[in-house]
Amino acid sequence: MERTLTDRITNKTWSIRQSGNQVYIASNGGKAKEKGFDEPEQAAKYVQKETWSRLKKGFVLHNPQAGAGQPVLHRYIGGGYTGFMPLAATQDTNTFFSSYVIGQFEKAEIYLMDDQGEKQTTCELPGKQLIFDMRYCAAQKILLLNADHQIAGLSLDNGEIERYTPMMPTSTLSVSGSSALWYDKSSLVVYDLRTNTVRYTRQVECEKYGGHSLQLCAVLSHDGRLMAYCTRTDEIVIVNMTTMQERTIAKDKNAMTSSMAFSPDDRWLFTQEQYGSWSLKCYDLNTMTGCRDWITPEIKSFAIHERRGLLAVYNYGKIQLFDLHTMKPTIAFEVEHVVKNCTLAFTKDYLVVYTDYGCVSLYALA
């Protein structure tokens, strides 16, 4: 393992390399200092600790030659409250959005970052608002925000914020092309961001899971032809957005559905469960039944790459990639600089990871 970090203000470099039980550290290309350990595991932990120390001081790791599963980028964006670690990426470029809470909830900052870790744009969301989720509509250059269960749109052209819904007791958010899906006044709404018109509404009643949490989760397919929503603990509804025909999938009552995503070919629907199994379920949309051959352990987050047909799943410090054409695992790798949780999003060439340590990273896919 070898890491080279750069302070972009002073142009100073710092590198660390592990070889078995030995660790070698050098600054600004100078002679390396050697440090020995009893076990390779101890040496690896020391490398992580020292690397993290430099990241917190403003150094950035950028290695575009990284192999599959290796970090292309590490950048520390802050040690305060990381909140829900929202990410939004466009799969046609390697830029992505992340958000960070400043101080004691004084404001939230939203960063548009490139694959070198440079902040191309910084936007402020004033007031004590917590961003739960973000979705980018590239067609209209609007970053949709779910802040405190209120949906708003941040225009990248003029920086103005438009509120689309009032603050609600629960929320959901999805984007496909110029269409956005959210919850407003007891109804699911599909809104055309290009024409500023409502395409579809469906009144729903959100059931309480366990008597404490409202069950609400909805998503559009990648091409916008399908919508899935879950407002009851025992079923998921699939809507054909052309014919408005509805079909129902029966699901286990012992888990709350917190997130959903269609496969790029609309063959599968993946659902992330909470409180029950905490697993990633997979449903066959041809038979409207669960896939018996699909089994994952407890997961914390997942993401799908539409162009490459990849699925990334995070649990217990590791990410597993799956090929959605074969439904088979490909590579697995450890996430660096994470405590328990992280969020995932795919750019064109990389997997973005935002950890609860406040570290934003890119990992190579091939």
Can you describe what each PLM-predicted range is?
Residues Y81-A89, G127-A139, P166-S178, E207-V219, ...:
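Repeated scaffold domains used in trafficking and secretory/extracellular systems
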Residues T95-F96, I142-L143, A180, M227, ...:
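Hydrophobic beta-strand positions that form the internal "hydrophobic ladder"
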